[in-house]
């Protein structure tokens, strides 16, 4: 089994996305985010092309349970622990990257 992000501090953040961003946003279950992160066809940007600091990694993968692509943002700390920072339904740009268009 491959490593998955630790969502200890961010579970509520991704699972209650629509409360912060509006009803058009999709809440993301941790299980969906992990499934997308482990997708064998996932596309990874290290560093994340949208990162201001260059410390985060963007992984775009498919979640069968959700039925759509999910973008997962992770960060490794100084102890090499993998933390989930956020996850959201992939936008059009990330979908194109995943489909290699």
Question: Model features per residue range: what roles?
Answer:
Residues 1-101:
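Ribonuclease/tRNase effector modules and their secretory precursors
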């Amino acid at each position: 089994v491959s490593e998955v992000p630790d969502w200890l501090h961010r579970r509520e953040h991704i699972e209650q996305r629509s409360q912060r961003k509006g009803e058009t946003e999709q809440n993301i279950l941790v299980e969906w985010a992990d499934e997308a992160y482990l997708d064998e066809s996932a596309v990874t940007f290290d560093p994340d092309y949208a990162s201001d600091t260059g410390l985060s990694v963007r992984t775009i993968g498919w979640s069968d349970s959700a039925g759509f692509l999910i973008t997962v943002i992770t960060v490794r700390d100084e102890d090499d622990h993998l933390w989930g920072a956020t996850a959201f339904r992939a936008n059009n740009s990330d979908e194109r990257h995943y489909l290699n268009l």
